[in-house]
């Protein structure tokens, strides 16, 4: 439990209250705290859900046994959201040599800071922070902090929710507890997620009580490639929502679009512009999505209930900023104004697969997008993404499940995947080996990036410093081709949503030699694959494998073979068109007299491979990997067999390339040395 997590963002006055703990709190500490040698001698979290308010009480103590922990405890910060509740501090004490030093009684008060800790992530939440500068701490002290916070979310209209990770071993706690309670008559439901035993449960004085002793047992390890529902850490979710339909219905009042676009307003003008440009619904949707992505900056305003309450579309467009809710509502209003069937949906961008096993609460989600239904197909439109265009609008994000926001309520629906129509990256390479098997290979790489992958290159495309551009190209290509880049340019086609990187460079040591044969191992999207999910443990044998994606990579390589290479052979699998381990592989290779053409692609979307099919998947990938193409040249002309004139002629393009590096930065000694070596 980090020092700075003494109270979760809480929450309705702007002044810290110094009062006794709530009457319902049952203290856990029973002596021996000052003598404890655990780093966290005490951790007591108690939560009460009642009358639409969630109260969170925390009593925590730290043993300061090192200079590092002493420094960390020098300032204690308690944060809260004043639009939703209060922060109360009940105790701030130092236990030293059998004495109790009451810092609050001694007049210690915090500095109240209003700062946006997430501003670099474009997030404004109105958090206030009470920063206590603790005086006179010494090694061996025990610092004890007791506080509570209240949370009443205006968007939930009296409904309540609570979710928290459960502290597990190997975290060491001397005495630890997590206790939750609510009136027996309250319609509260709860669920534990992850590998954790059920809590003790009983009814007491008209309240239902759940109690965990902390830390709970360390969860059994899970394979990293398992679906997300298997990898959830221990946590508890509690809420007053009866089911997902209840969650959907409760949110729907905030996402109606009727009357949100003024008939003669700015948004109506944009709608008219799009309708005039095309009468094809999908093209209209793509244009509206582009407008929301490109012309409205992302900014989360969590103040005044903004974590769930959306900004009005007219305000979003006027300010040109908004979060996922604001962008989604703006996009939704525009689509409906154009007669396109659409609705807002809640998703979890971090672990969507776990939503299906979650307790129905709004907190199971962290993101909102729009689901449009056009010509029988669902399109999942994310206004916070970037670079989406008609060619990529059909790509399905990896969210797993979605909750439609409807006035009548709705259940979870799957975010069903489909194969993308356009590659995220198209790599075209001219690979010039004509100088010989001992010479560096000259190459020109022409790469197109689409969608969000392309949008990431916008900054580089705007750069004027050629040295920085070449550096960016070098960094990207070092794991694709390697070697040295000596010239590059980066552009971004805003209309197409495509970034283009064109680079010239040279690669080294592209051949291996054995008994007079030079071998070059062809690289591409379909080469160097492996598939080795570990299911050796008996507890893992029924756990499926989860693929990544969606991601589609296509490559086109054109080789200029070494001069006077009469005996060139191609081994390996020259054609592929199959689905293996959840990945589509395509390959076509053609060896000519002076050239070698290699075209291939891979595509995978999020899916699960049942444990029973993993053996077949391993064998399929092993077979594909064993057929990685290899070019073999028998009796190639070696460098020492060439005369000086031929060597000079063949090396001149390489020297010219090195000279371009010197032109970029003439005082770089390494560039001069490189050219000198050539």
Question: Can you annotate each of these PLM segments?
Answer:
Residues 1-8:
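Bacterial N-terminal signal peptides
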Residues 12-664, 670-674:
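A sensor for short, sequence-defined functional sites
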